[in-house]
Amino acid sequence: MIIGLTGGIASGKSTVVEIIKDARYKVIDADQLVHDMQVKGGRLYQALLDWLGYGILLPNGELNRPKLGQLIFSSEEMRYQSAEIQGKIIREELAAKRDCLAKEDDVFFMDIPLLFENDYQDWFDQIWLVAVSPQVQCQRLMKRNHLSAEEAGMRIASQMPLAEKLPYASLVIDNNGNIDDLKKKVKGAIKDLANLV
């Protein structure tokens, strides 16, 4: 059984992943995979360099991630081009990791932030969605990424609205509360999952 885990930016998905890992389930992390491929010499690093040029690099040759984020989130056209350029490479790498882990484990998770936006839903037996209110999401994103309200709003607006994701979720994990509430909900879901398998 493969479970997709998703949620909007700053929804608390990373905390949910840690709780799942503590329960001894393996999690393929799409963001980490992307990060690894964006290091100097990686597949995405080269694709981004070919697309945007050397202006996106720091003096040491690494990607200037804040600048890259500003460029990509500056317009719908830039987001679309980024998805086109990076999406195919990411999908190939995630599929390879999924297929490899499926040979070892009967149950595992894949943490994919843009699961619905990039049409990954057919990959999964279940989809767990971490949900927060727009106000909580904006506050967390501003604090975590040191963004203005306008910058945070642009990033949130670039993702599919929560209401459109809800019908596709097997489980919705409400994360408007505190960490203890979240742990209780996720541990309960993991217990239910163990009873299914």
Curated annotation (Swiss-Prot):
Gene Ontology terms for molecular function: ATP binding; dephospho-CoA kinase activity
One of the GO BP terms on file: coenzyme A biosynthetic process
Main location: cytoplasm
Tagged with keyword Chloroplast: no
Superkingdom of the source species: Bacteria
A Pfam match: CoaE
EC top class, as a word: transferase
Places the protein is found: Cytoplasm
Binding residue positions for ATP: A10, S11, G12, K13, S14, T15
One GO cellular component term: cytoplasm
Pathway stated in the Swiss-Prot or TrEMBL entry: Cofactor biosynthesis; coenzyme A biosynthesis; CoA from (R)-pantothenate: step 5/5
Similarity remark: Belongs to the CoaE family.
UniProt xrefs under NCBIfam families: dephospho-CoA kinase (TIGR00152)
The protein, known as: Dephospho-CoA kinase
Organism per entry: Streptococcus thermophilus (strain CNRZ 1066)
Gene: coaE
